[in-house]
């Protein structure tokens, strides 16, 4: 569903719980960004991005964590990127929302980790190899696959995080192609 529509988000959470039972795993992979300078952008972009990148995570966690606490187990994995740790040029409408998202996830991890809920933040430090990504930035259209994070590899890492033993839970996990400059 459109996670920026909070009423619809709540409705979908209730429907999933009613039809399938309480989820044990939540993957928050919603993202919206505008990449312009402060003066070229619009202040309302920050609010729109915040609603998708951060507020939707809060509503999902609020709807699903009570059942995880009751079951004494659960996994919440939030996907993000380097904007969560540093603002760069052309990200004043995006970076603050990703930083807030990471801090929210960290707060949830500290609150609910002792209750059996593993919360992790997966930072993908690369463009992801999708048709949308390749057409969004013209210089990426003809680039070799090796410069991109591959969706299957990201999914494999998410699965790995979700399967971690309680004695070795991670929170900040960074992944990137080997040629990514960092």
Q: What function would you assign to each model-found segment?
A:
Residues 24, 32, 39-58, 77, ...:
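Catalytic Tyr-X3-Lys loop
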Residues 75-100, 106, 110-113:
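Catalytic loop of short-chain dehydrogenase/reductase
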Residues 29-30, 76-83, 122-124:
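SDR active-site strand-loop-helix element
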Residues 1-11, 43:
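The beta1-alpha1 cofactor-binding region of Rossmann-like NAD(H)/NADP(H)-dependent oxidoreductases
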Residues 22-23, 37, 68-81, 114-117:
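Active-site loop of short-chain dehydrogenase/reductase
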Residues 61-62, 106:
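A short, exposed helix-loop element centered on a Lys and neighboring polar residues
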Residues 114-123, 141-182:
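C-terminal helical subdomain
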Residues 15-26, 34:
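A glycine-rich helix->loop->beta "capping" turn
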